[in-house]
Amino acid sequence: MSLVLRHCHSRSRTFILTRHLSSKPSSTKVPLLYKPEQDDQTDTVTLQLLSWGKGASGQLGGGIEEIRLYPTPVANLIVSQSSFALSPTPGRRVSSTNPLGEVGLSCGLFHSSLLVNGKLWIWGKGDGGRLGFGHENPLFVPTLNPHLDSVRSVALGGVHSVALTSLGEVFTWGYGGFGALGHSVYHRELFPRLVEGSWSGKIHHIATSGTHTAAITESGELYTWGRDEGDGRLGLGPNRGPNEGGGLSIPSKVKELPIPVTAVFCGGFFTMALTEQGQLWNWGANSNYELGRGDKVGGWKPKPIPSLEDVCVIQVASGGYHSLALTDDGKVLSWGYGRHGQLGHSSILNQKIPVVIEALSDEHVVYIACGGSSSAAVTDKGKLYMWGNAKDSQLGVPGLPEVQPSPVEVKFLTEDDGLGPPNVLSVAVGASHAMCLVMRSAS
């Protein structure tokens, strides 16, 4: 399949919620987590948060439970239809617009978050202080964190969390032993703490993984910090790297990037960055073809992926050892480690270079996500597809084998709640659970 693209246009990717939908009062069975102020309810629509997969640590948000076999509602949101959009997502090119309100999801290893209009709800496992409430206890339902406000974007890591505010400030909290918090020390932070980086101006994009974190300034400079076990995932080069415990807790500029970047995604042991023109650069570990260059040569120096130099990428997402790229014409490519079926090519073979997922070729994909060893895609018609590791029911389709190597559509069981079929807007995937945000029209 030819993927030579002349220009990079993300023509409908801002996800402004402007469809002419009406909403009815939702069922009392699903908690109403958010609604506009009393004087701002003339133009509203109902969004619904659903979760599935393994939930022993509370990450599903529905109380104490072990597992959900299929997507189940967690909360309803009533939002202003004309002014809400999806919040900035790690690995996705940032829209120039800044709507009045934004909504977004994030899944960490065993914790989850929901962002609505600058406010952050967070829940799941609490070890290391990753929830930011001043303790390490788990929370089994979405709980508003009172220590943050005006949040624009959230990225959840393994045992830590990162938030970006509308003022361009970065806050981190949780386990600090890997240096992923960026506070020049390696102890835990039980409350959100401001990262005092050496950058000038505001930060406009963040990302994190299990052990390292990245941030991009408004001018396109990239800073990284956290763990680097000699694989080069921080992109900093010799003599600029880890010290205590293999971590670097000082945000440091990636000087070898020759051009400004607008989005970044942190994989397990590697890093991906996107330019404004849609060119994808990466660096770090490559023993499983994570860098998509056709060989296993890794390293700290950022380089473009040769086979994608004429392809316009609008979003990149990575798991532990694999990646997805979404092009501006709605195609999805995958590469890297494939033994759990996470590449979507109907096999469990590793993939040396990015290859289009043919099973999705008839769909126009608008959003992608990766878990540790699973993958997801949302289409322009609001459908959700998932594939990869299904051991913990994290694909949301009961009865699948533990390895699902081709995309399957996730179906939704809707109760008689006065709302119509779910129209999926976004998805987030953790190690063994997943969540999605759907729009519910009136039935």
Residue ranges with predicted function:
Residues 1-37:
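N-terminal mitochondrial targeting presequence
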Residues 35-39, 43-45, 49-70, 82-83, ...:
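Short glycine/serine- and acidic-residue-enriched loop/turn motifs that recur at repeat junctions
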Residues 64, 98, 106, 135-138, ...:
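Conserved loop/turn at the beginning of each blade in beta-propeller domains
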Residues 104, 108-225, 231-233:
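A generic tandem-repeat structural signature
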Residues 119, 166-169, 178, 205, ...:
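Tandem repeat domain/solenoid detector
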Residues 383-384, 389, 400, 405-443:
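Blade-level signature of beta-propeller repeat domains, shared across WD40, Kelch, NHL, RCC1
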